[in-house]
Amino acid sequence: MYKRQEKDWGKDDFTKIPNGCAGIENMYPYMLSAANEGKITFNKAVELCSYNPAKIFGCDAKGAIEVGKDADIVIYDPTKDFTITNDKMHSDCDHTIWEGIKVKGYPEATYSRGKLVFKDGEFLGERGWGKFIKRSSSGNL
C-alpha cells in the first residue's frame, strides 16, 4: 500500500513509481458483494480469497476450515450496506481508489487462530499476535 506522496516519487522517472494500489482491505467486501449480486457463488468467493491464496503461497494451515488448520474465519453479514471511504480503512494508506463505492454485505467479525481480532469495524488484534508462517514447498493449486 502506498501514500499519495510515494506515488509522486516517479513523476520524473516512471521506474521509481511503486507498483499497485491500496485495496486488499476491500477484497472481501467486493467479492462478497459480487456473490450477493449473483455474479459469483459464495463458495467461489471463499475459494478466490482464502483457499487459493493459501495453496499458492504454500500456507498449509490456512485457507479452509478443517481439523488441524488454524481457526481463521470471517463472520459476514450479507444484508449490511457499506460505503467504502478512506476514513473507514484500517491501513496506513491515505486514500482508497474505491472511495464512495457501495457494497452489499460486510464482515462483522474476524477470528485469527480462534481469537477475535476484528469486530464491528474495529481492529482488536494485539501487537505481536501475528506469527511467521513457514511455507511448504508445494505452492500449487
Task: Write out the residue ranges for each language-model feature.
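Hydrophobic aliphatic residue packing
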Residues: 1-2, 117
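His/Asp/Glu-enriched, well-ordered alpha-helical/loop segment
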Residues: 3-79
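C-terminal cap of metal-dependent C-N hydrolases
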Residues: 8-19, 70-131
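Generic alpha-helical secondary structure signal
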Residues: 32-34, 46, 102, 115, ...
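Short, positively charged
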Residues: 41-44, 85-91, 139-140
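Short, solvent-exposed cationic patches
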Residues: 132-141
